[in-house]
């Protein structure tokens, strides 16, 4: 639904924050979003990005550099939207699958390269990246919390952390 309908309902139900699931942040009126959040005493905590993978197959691991570039641009637009709230940009489905990269090794290399770029952007926009650990039915990489922590500890990301979704954790 639209912000004008959903946000008052959320406020009335006692919510103080919202996670939006957006395909493309350029398609929303950011000023209107901000006004509606303020009017309803809400803040934006995070943006879920999986729709861009499901709809356009944008992902940060793809063998095709142009697809990775478009995925990073899409995520940058979400950072601009989340910036006033120091929000989290959740990368779940947009991490892609091994088949998108061509091999597990290329997948990991492309994810690391993309996260390096995105982490620097997150610093610039004052937001955070939440790398979502997903279950083995929906992801090929990092299913368990300890694996995600190990992966992050191998890198020097400043604004990237693990996003833990209990739906996925209950599977693995």
Features from the language model and the residues they span:
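Acidic-and-aromatic substrate-binding clefts and catalytic sites of carbohydrate-active enzymes
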Residues: 1, 20-32, 98-100, 136-142, ...
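N-terminal pre-domain/capping segments
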Residues: 1-83, 116, 157
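A cross-domain feature marking catalytic cores of carbohydrate-active enzymes
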Residues: 20-24, 46-51, 91-94, 131-135, ...
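Active-site acidic/histidine proton-transfer and metal-coordination neighborhood
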Residues: 61-161, 171
């Amino acid at each position: 639904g639209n912000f004008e309908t959903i946000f008052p309902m959320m406020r009335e139900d006692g919510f103080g924050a919202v996670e939006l699931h957006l395909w493309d942040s350029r398609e929303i009126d950011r000023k209107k979003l901000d006004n509606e959040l303020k009017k309803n005493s809400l803040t934006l905590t995070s943006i879920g990005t999986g729709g861009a993978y499901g709809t356009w197959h944008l992902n940060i691991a793809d063998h095709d550099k142009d697809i990775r570039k478009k995925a990073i641009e899409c995520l940058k637009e979400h950072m601009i939207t989340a910036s006033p709230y120091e929000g989290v940009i959740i990368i779940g489905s947009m991490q892609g699958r091994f088949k998108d990269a061509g091999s597990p090794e290329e997948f990991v290399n492309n994810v690391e390269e993309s996260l390096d770029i995105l982490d620097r952007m997150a610093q610039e926009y004052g937001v955070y990246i939440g790398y979502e650990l997903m279950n083995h039915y929906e992801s090929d990489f990092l299913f368990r919390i300890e694996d995600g922590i190990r992966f992050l500890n191998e890198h020097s990301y400043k604004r990237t952390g693990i996003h833990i979704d209990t739906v996925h954790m209950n599977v693995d």
